Amino acid sequence: MELRRSMALPRLLLLGLWAAALRDGAVAAGMKFTGSPIKLKVSQGQPVKLNCSLEGMEDPEMLWIKDGAVVQSVDQVYIPVDEDHWIGFLSLKSVERTDSGKYWCQVENGGKKEESQQVWLIVEGVPYFTVEPEDVSVSPNAPFHMACAAVGPPEPVTIVWWMGDSRVGLPDISPSILNVSGINQSTMFSCEAHNVKGLSSSRTATVQIKAMPLPPLNVTVSQVTSSNASVVWVPGFDGRAPLHSCTLQVAESPDGQEVSTEVAPVPPFAYGVQGLKHSTNYSVRVQCSNEMGSSPFTERVYFQTLELAPSSTPQNIHVIQRDPGLVLEWEGVAPDVLKENVLGYRLEWIQDNVTQGEMIVQDTKANLTTWNPLKDLIIRVCVLNSAGCGPWSDLFLLEAQEVMGGQRQPPYGTSWVPVALGILTALVTAVALALILLRKRRKETRFGHAFGSVVGRGDPAVHFRAARSFNREGPELIEATLESVGISDELKTKLKDVLIQEQQFTLGRMLGKGEFGSVREALLKLDDGSFQKVAVKMLKADIFTSTDIEEFLREAACMKEFDHPHVTKLIGVSLRSRPKGRLPIPMVILPFMKHGDLHAFLLMSRIGENPFNLPLQTLLKFMIDIASGMEYLSSKNFIHRDLAARNCMLDENMNVSVADFGLSKKIYSGDYYRQGCASKLPVKWLALESLADNLYTTHSDVWAFGVTMWEIVTRGQTPYAGIENAEIYNYLISGNRLKQPPECLEDVYDLMCRCWHPEPKLRPSFGVLRSQLEMIRGRMSTLSLSQDPLYVNIGKDKESSVSDPAVHTSFGNTDGDETIAGAAAAAITSDYRYIMSPLCLGDDVEGERHPEGQEGENKSLLYELETEGEKSC
């Protein structure tokens, strides 16, 4: 059906994609798409906006599908009309032919994918060429033809031909063939394609005239033997016609008498000449041919064949004992028997089945000095000339017991010594390999593998462009205020100045979803009218009470106090209204971090679909950033309690910020906090005192920082892989620690071990850790950071304004952006495990330091260093 242009939006075509029923009719109870299918024709280059409406589902994750594939457009917005009514928009700012196809919405509900009916988008424009004139070569005045074809829509398409600057023939419906009777000089041809939208011009093709080839170049002769030679050449200009053969003329020199003429099919441009005489001078020249004729011959190239190798063998070998060596004699080859120009003889002697040496002599006698008279001696001789060595003589054996006199010539026996040595070597090798594999298996069993495999799903980073903001308040909605959510007065006071009205931002696609909530990309409208890309963290609609809201917003209140480049800063909080007197949905607005969490980024670098190198200098920078942020937090008397790579975020400039303060606490008195019951804790990052007595201090954050350093060095491996949560405390109290990764510097691992000291007060402060890491990185500064491979082609944003908020995370060409972003998204799996706190004490703040009993118990945690296997603390 035709789409009329709106008077209010003359250049914006709105398509209502309203699907009345899902394809299979299996609609979940109460959930439905509304509307009907539609067919749209639009001109190329025009903007188009598609929308679909879904009712009966809270917080759906809608996807746009085109021809069966998920649409990766950056211009997608999802707007809640009310609690269970959502509208999704897909904007195409300048449609191309490739945008033509079938579009529909898809949502997953209860494990089933439900789809709306389809919309057909047809993009019309000037004709598009499918066949264009090609460059060809033709014989003079010979007939030939040219082809041209183009398609719409719209149809029909008419073809007009041009020869040089003149039109040829009459317009013809595509596809068109132009028949040319012949030309005698190079000529250019092109075609035009016309339809009601306009015309397109094809490429200009050049038709050349064929000619005879030019002579070959660089003729060389190689691999010369006594009877053969290899000739290689480079073809000259082929006359714009393929060469089909080359002719070689071989002649004896100096009289130039032709010996043979050889025709070689080409390519390859090489030929082996056979049947030549030995020790003879020859010359060769080459010409090549195409359908138009043959080139002139090249200049002659001269070469000489080699001599024949000797064919006779020395006879009657005998040896005479002399002190200190042996004199060997044999019958020489008569000069009138051979014409191979004998140069001498080669003698070879063997002991213990190994050639001990050889010598070349001019006459028929040789003096042997370097041999062992206590072992059997085998001798053989051949005739030698410039072509090589002739056949070997019969083997002559001189046994050890006959050294002092006699001599005989028994057959050449076989020794079993090499066989026995070979078998022994194979057995030793097999045993060594078995021991290596066994040792490796034991290590894997004890510590496990960090990961089996991580398969990137190819999901792209989430991008969108918000065309406008929407007021979602209706007559049924109760205004969402801090007074309406049932939180404490203290928390209301803290959040009052950072409360943002929900009309000020527009939600985009979902970035991630967890057990208790989700994170969406959004555009926040600022006071000056500009827009800022942010991330919105919200609780799920069906799992929270006033207590849940208060705990969720306490994290925001905690972040409000932070102002440091390496600590995530709160932008604001907001409340989404809901009907029927239900509690509003709390939302925390945070800066948008382009590269996501650090753990996912590290995994992507190691086992993503397109792994990339993270130099040690870059890894050290990550550690320094985290240490700097934690130094700031500790100076503010904050303990994090959940420091890990997964809770650190990476921005577009590769700077790390400490984030996720859901477990953080401020210490108003004393230096420690005692955890109450019913809190979930990341066991493998906890310090010994935290596991034993639920005590949390800045020193316990230092322990977690050591584990985070280990995560960074291993590029995201799981700490204590293969060890259950319930076993961690006994594992640590026994003196065990994480092992030194293979590529970890000694200085860096020493810092980790200091972070894991059993006595909390003997662990370094974050200021000391930052300083030490900066010193280590400074010693590596010989390699300029500008040469750091990590910074090659990252963030290839062509536009950074709100008009095109596309995000690219590329480590290669632009085609790899979505693949790498998808691999990072696939890597965010929160693969660590939690257990409940072992003690159920009151969740309060104690204004005292460790009692003596606790200090004594902590001191009892001291252990002796283990030295077996890999290096450990």
UniProtKB/Swiss-Prot annotation:
For this protein, the record's CDD domains field holds: FN3 (cd00063), IgI_2_Axl_Tyro3_like (cd05749), PTKc_Tyro3 (cd05074)
Name one molecular function that GO assigns to this entry.
Answer: ATP binding
TM spans, by residue? 417-437
| Occurrences of domain Ig-like C2-type (ranges) | 29-116, 127-208
Domain Protein kinase stretches: 505-776
Q: List the disulfide bonds.
A: 52-105, 148-191
Q: Tell me where it resides.
A: Cell membrane
Q: Which reaction does it catalyse?
A: L-tyrosyl-[protein] + ATP = O-phospho-L-tyrosyl-[protein] + ADP + H(+)
- Residues that bind ATP, according to the entry? 511-519, 537
**Residue segments, region Disordered:** 845-873
Q: What is its EC number?
A: 2.7.10.1
Q: Name one GO cellular component term.
A: plasma membrane
- Compositional bias ranges of the Basic and acidic residues kind: 847-858
Which residues of this protein are catalytic? Answer: 642
Write out the similarity annotation: Belongs to the protein kinase superfamily. Tyr protein kinase family. AXL/UFO subfamily.
Name of the protein in its database record: Tyrosine-protein kinase receptor TYRO3
Native species: Gallus gallus
